[in-house]
Amino acid sequence: WPILDGVLVTAMTYNGTIPGPMIKVTEGDRVKVVFTNQLEEPTTIHWHGVEVPNAMDGVPGITQAPIQPGETFTYEFVAKPAGTFIYHSHYESDRQVSAGLYGPFIIEPRASQRPEPDVDVTLMLSEWLVRDGVTYPAMPMSGMEPNYFTINGKAYPATETLHVKVGQTVRLRLIGIGQFIHPMHLHGFPFKVMAIDGHPVPETAQQTMDTLSVAPGQRFDIEFTPTEPGQWMFHCHILHHTTNDNVDPGGLMMIIEVTP
Protein backbone atom coordinates (compact mmCIF):
# COMPACT_ATOMS: atom_id res chain seq x y z
CA TRP A 1 0.00 0.00 0.00
CA PRO A 2 1.51 3.39 -0.97
CA ILE A 3 1.34 5.79 1.97
CA LEU A 4 3.54 8.29 0.16
CA ASP A 5 5.24 8.62 -3.21
CA GLY A 6 8.07 6.09 -3.08
CA VAL A 7 7.05 4.60 0.28
CA LEU A 8 5.22 1.28 0.26
CA VAL A 9 4.05 -0.60 3.35
CA THR A 10 3.13 -4.26 3.69
CA ALA A 11 -0.54 -4.06 4.60
CA MET A 12 -3.70 -6.03 5.26
CA THR A 13 -6.84 -4.46 3.81
CA TYR A 14 -10.60 -4.69 3.58
CA ASN A 15 -11.50 -4.73 -0.14
CA GLY A 16 -8.05 -3.49 -1.10
CA THR A 17 -8.08 -0.04 0.52
CA ILE A 18 -6.85 1.68 3.68
CA PRO A 19 -9.08 2.58 5.40
CA GLY A 20 -11.57 -0.08 4.37
CA PRO A 21 -14.73 1.05 2.56
CA MET A 22 -16.94 3.46 4.48
CA ILE A 23 -20.10 1.71 5.64
CA LYS A 24 -22.87 4.29 6.02
CA VAL A 25 -26.32 3.26 7.22
CA THR A 26 -29.31 4.84 8.96
CA GLU A 27 -30.23 4.26 12.59
CA GLY A 28 -32.57 1.28 12.80
CA ASP A 29 -31.38 -0.33 9.54
CA ARG A 30 -30.74 -4.05 9.61
CA VAL A 31 -27.09 -4.51 8.68
CA LYS A 32 -25.77 -7.69 7.06
CA VAL A 33 -22.05 -7.94 6.32
CA VAL A 34 -20.85 -11.12 4.60
CA PHE A 35 -17.14 -11.34 5.32
CA THR A 36 -14.77 -13.74 3.53
CA ASN A 37 -11.26 -14.07 4.92
CA GLN A 38 -8.72 -14.02 2.09
CA LEU A 39 -5.78 -13.50 4.41
CA GLU A 40 -3.26 -16.21 5.16
CA GLU A 41 -4.18 -16.09 8.86
CA PRO A 42 -7.34 -15.94 11.02
CA THR A 43 -9.17 -12.71 11.73
CA THR A 44 -12.51 -11.25 12.92
CA ILE A 45 -14.37 -7.94 12.68
CA HIS A 46 -15.29 -5.93 15.78
CA TRP A 47 -17.91 -3.14 15.53
CA HIS A 48 -16.27 -0.58 17.80
CA GLY A 49 -18.85 1.41 19.78
CA VAL A 50 -21.87 -0.09 17.99
CA GLU A 51 -24.53 -1.78 20.12
CA VAL A 52 -24.57 -5.30 18.66
CA PRO A 53 -25.70 -8.72 19.95
CA ASN A 54 -22.92 -10.47 21.86
CA ALA A 55 -22.46 -13.09 19.14
CA MET A 56 -21.72 -10.31 16.62
CA ASP A 57 -19.06 -8.53 18.72
CA GLY A 58 -16.13 -10.10 16.88
CA VAL A 59 -13.88 -11.08 19.79
CA PRO A 60 -12.07 -14.34 18.93
CA GLY A 61 -12.24 -17.07 21.54
CA ILE A 62 -14.96 -15.23 23.48
CA THR A 63 -17.88 -14.33 21.20
CA GLN A 64 -16.87 -16.34 18.12
CA ALA A 65 -14.23 -18.65 16.74
CA PRO A 66 -11.58 -16.91 14.64
CA ILE A 67 -12.52 -16.80 10.96
CA GLN A 68 -9.97 -19.04 9.28
CA PRO A 69 -8.41 -18.38 5.85
CA GLY A 70 -11.00 -19.12 3.16
CA GLU A 71 -13.93 -19.11 5.59
CA THR A 72 -16.96 -16.81 5.44
CA PHE A 73 -18.79 -15.35 8.42
CA THR A 74 -21.94 -13.22 8.34
CA TYR A 75 -22.39 -10.36 10.79
CA GLU A 76 -26.00 -9.21 11.31
CA PHE A 77 -27.33 -6.53 13.65
CA VAL A 78 -29.57 -3.48 13.86
CA ALA A 79 -27.66 -0.21 13.45
CA LYS A 80 -27.72 1.76 16.71
CA PRO A 81 -27.10 4.31 18.06
CA ALA A 82 -26.49 7.07 15.51
CA GLY A 83 -22.93 8.35 15.38
CA THR A 84 -19.35 7.84 14.22
CA PHE A 85 -17.98 4.34 14.80
CA ILE A 86 -15.27 1.96 13.57
CA TYR A 87 -14.96 -1.57 12.31
CA HIS A 88 -11.60 -3.28 12.82
CA SER A 89 -9.93 -6.62 13.37
CA HIS A 90 -9.90 -8.02 16.90
CA TYR A 91 -7.57 -10.95 16.15
CA GLU A 92 -3.98 -10.12 17.12
CA SER A 93 -5.34 -6.62 16.77
CA ASP A 94 -2.14 -4.80 17.75
CA ARG A 95 -0.62 -6.23 14.57
CA GLN A 96 -3.62 -6.53 12.22
CA VAL A 97 -5.08 -3.09 12.95
CA SER A 98 -1.63 -1.53 12.63
CA ALA A 99 -1.40 -3.23 9.22
CA GLY A 100 -4.59 -1.57 7.97
CA LEU A 101 -7.58 -3.70 9.00
CA TYR A 102 -9.91 -0.84 9.93
CA GLY A 103 -12.60 1.33 8.41
CA PRO A 104 -15.30 3.89 9.30
CA PHE A 105 -18.83 2.83 10.23
CA ILE A 106 -21.25 5.77 10.15
CA ILE A 107 -24.82 5.54 11.46
CA GLU A 108 -26.91 8.50 10.37
CA PRO A 109 -29.74 9.54 12.71
CA ARG A 110 -33.25 8.54 11.71
CA ALA A 111 -34.51 12.02 12.60
CA SER A 112 -31.77 14.56 13.29
CA GLN A 113 -32.46 17.51 15.56
CA ARG A 114 -29.53 19.42 14.06
CA PRO A 115 -29.02 20.88 10.56
CA GLU A 116 -26.75 18.80 8.36
CA PRO A 117 -23.35 20.31 7.48
CA ASP A 118 -22.44 21.31 3.94
CA VAL A 119 -19.30 19.16 4.05
CA ASP A 120 -18.92 15.90 5.99
CA VAL A 121 -15.50 14.19 5.97
CA THR A 122 -14.12 11.26 7.97
CA LEU A 123 -10.43 11.23 8.95
CA MET A 124 -8.78 8.12 10.43
CA LEU A 125 -5.45 8.74 12.20
CA SER A 126 -2.80 6.03 12.33
CA GLU A 127 0.93 5.23 12.37
CA TRP A 128 3.44 2.96 10.62
CA LEU A 129 6.94 1.70 11.26
CA VAL A 130 9.04 1.03 8.16
CA ARG A 131 12.67 0.06 8.60
CA ASP A 132 14.93 -0.99 5.70
CA GLY A 133 11.87 -1.62 3.57
CA VAL A 134 10.24 -3.91 6.15
CA THR A 135 6.92 -2.95 7.79
CA TYR A 136 6.50 -3.57 11.53
CA PRO A 137 3.53 -2.89 13.87
CA ALA A 138 4.01 0.60 15.32
CA MET A 139 3.73 0.43 19.11
CA PRO A 140 4.37 2.72 22.10
CA MET A 141 7.46 0.81 23.23
CA SER A 142 11.19 1.24 22.83
CA GLY A 143 12.39 0.37 19.36
CA MET A 144 8.88 0.11 17.91
CA GLU A 145 7.91 3.78 17.67
CA PRO A 146 6.44 4.80 14.30
CA ASN A 147 8.32 6.80 11.70
CA TYR A 148 5.33 7.46 9.41
CA PHE A 149 1.95 8.91 10.35
CA THR A 150 -1.15 8.81 8.16
CA ILE A 151 -4.57 10.34 7.64
CA ASN A 152 -6.84 7.89 5.82
CA GLY A 153 -3.83 5.76 4.94
CA LYS A 154 -1.74 8.59 3.45
CA ALA A 155 1.11 10.76 4.79
CA TYR A 156 1.50 14.42 3.80
CA PRO A 157 1.94 15.55 1.04
CA ALA A 158 -0.06 12.56 -0.22
CA THR A 159 -2.97 13.38 2.12
CA GLU A 160 -6.12 14.56 0.39
CA THR A 161 -6.76 18.32 0.19
CA LEU A 162 -10.22 19.27 1.45
CA HIS A 163 -11.95 21.88 -0.74
CA VAL A 164 -14.59 24.05 0.97
CA LYS A 165 -16.07 27.54 0.61
CA VAL A 166 -16.30 30.52 2.95
CA GLY A 167 -19.47 30.27 5.01
CA GLN A 168 -19.97 26.52 4.62
CA THR A 169 -20.44 24.37 7.69
CA VAL A 170 -17.74 21.69 7.73
CA ARG A 171 -17.89 18.53 9.82
CA LEU A 172 -14.75 16.49 10.43
CA ARG A 173 -15.23 13.05 11.96
CA LEU A 174 -11.90 12.35 13.70
CA ILE A 175 -11.11 8.71 14.47
CA GLY A 176 -8.06 7.51 16.39
CA ILE A 177 -7.28 4.04 15.05
CA GLY A 178 -3.56 3.77 15.85
CA GLN A 179 -1.84 3.38 19.21
CA PHE A 180 -0.83 6.98 19.87
CA ILE A 181 -2.59 10.17 20.99
CA HIS A 182 -2.79 12.93 18.38
CA PRO A 183 -3.64 16.53 19.42
CA MET A 184 -5.16 17.78 16.15
CA HIS A 185 -4.86 21.52 15.54
CA LEU A 186 -6.80 23.60 13.01
CA HIS A 187 -5.28 26.79 11.61
CA GLY A 188 -7.45 29.81 10.89
CA PHE A 189 -10.74 28.97 12.59
CA PRO A 190 -12.05 27.61 15.88
CA PHE A 191 -14.26 24.54 15.91
CA LYS A 192 -16.94 23.12 18.18
CA VAL A 193 -17.03 19.54 19.47
CA MET A 194 -20.45 18.26 18.43
CA ALA A 195 -20.19 14.58 19.37
CA ILE A 196 -17.88 12.30 21.36
CA ASP A 197 -17.68 8.56 20.72
CA GLY A 198 -20.88 8.73 18.69
CA HIS A 199 -22.90 10.58 21.31
CA PRO A 200 -24.10 14.16 20.65
CA VAL A 201 -22.82 16.87 22.97
CA PRO A 202 -25.67 19.07 24.27
CA GLU A 203 -25.49 22.59 22.87
CA THR A 204 -24.91 24.06 26.33
CA ALA A 205 -21.87 21.79 26.81
CA GLN A 206 -20.22 22.22 23.40
CA GLN A 207 -16.66 23.50 23.68
CA THR A 208 -15.02 25.90 21.23
CA MET A 209 -11.42 24.84 20.59
CA ASP A 210 -8.61 24.86 18.05
CA THR A 211 -6.72 21.78 19.32
CA LEU A 212 -8.26 18.45 20.31
CA SER A 213 -6.45 15.31 21.49
CA VAL A 214 -7.70 12.16 19.79
CA ALA A 215 -6.80 8.98 21.69
CA PRO A 216 -6.76 5.43 20.29
CA GLY A 217 -10.33 4.24 19.71
CA GLN A 218 -11.83 7.70 20.25
CA ARG A 219 -14.12 9.50 17.83
CA PHE A 220 -14.94 13.20 17.75
CA ASP A 221 -17.29 15.04 15.41
CA ILE A 222 -16.14 18.64 15.13
CA GLU A 223 -17.69 21.47 13.10
CA PHE A 224 -16.44 24.85 11.92
CA THR A 225 -17.33 27.58 9.44
CA PRO A 226 -14.45 29.07 7.41
CA THR A 227 -14.44 32.87 7.34
CA GLU A 228 -11.29 33.54 5.32
CA PRO A 229 -10.14 32.08 2.00
CA GLY A 230 -6.74 30.46 1.70
CA GLN A 231 -4.89 27.22 2.33
CA TRP A 232 -5.24 26.32 5.99
CA MET A 233 -3.36 23.53 7.71
CA PHE A 234 -4.89 20.82 9.89
CA HIS A 235 -2.24 18.77 11.67
CA CYS A 236 -1.12 16.89 14.76
CA HIS A 237 0.64 19.16 17.25
CA ILE A 238 3.04 16.50 18.44
CA LEU A 239 5.35 17.91 15.81
CA HIS A 240 7.36 14.74 15.32
CA HIS A 241 4.09 13.30 14.00
CA THR A 242 4.30 15.78 11.10
CA THR A 243 7.42 14.15 9.67
CA ASN A 244 8.12 11.31 7.25
CA ASP A 245 10.96 9.18 8.63
CA ASN A 246 12.15 12.25 10.57
CA VAL A 247 11.92 14.57 7.55
CA ASP A 248 9.67 17.64 7.93
CA PRO A 249 7.04 18.35 6.62
CA GLY A 250 5.03 15.17 6.41
CA GLY A 251 2.86 12.77 8.35
CA LEU A 252 -0.34 13.91 10.03
CA MET A 253 -0.93 17.05 7.99
CA MET A 254 -3.54 18.03 5.44
CA ILE A 255 -4.57 21.22 3.67
CA ILE A 256 -8.06 22.68 3.89
CA GLU A 257 -8.40 24.93 0.85
CA VAL A 258 -11.06 27.61 1.35
CA THR A 259 -12.36 29.56 -1.64
CA PRO A 260 -14.69 32.60 -1.63
Label the model's feature ranges.
Residues 33, 45, 89, 105, ...:
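Divalent metal-coordination and catalytic microenvironments
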Residues 39-42, 52, 58-116, 209-260:
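Extracellular/periplasmic metallocenter environments
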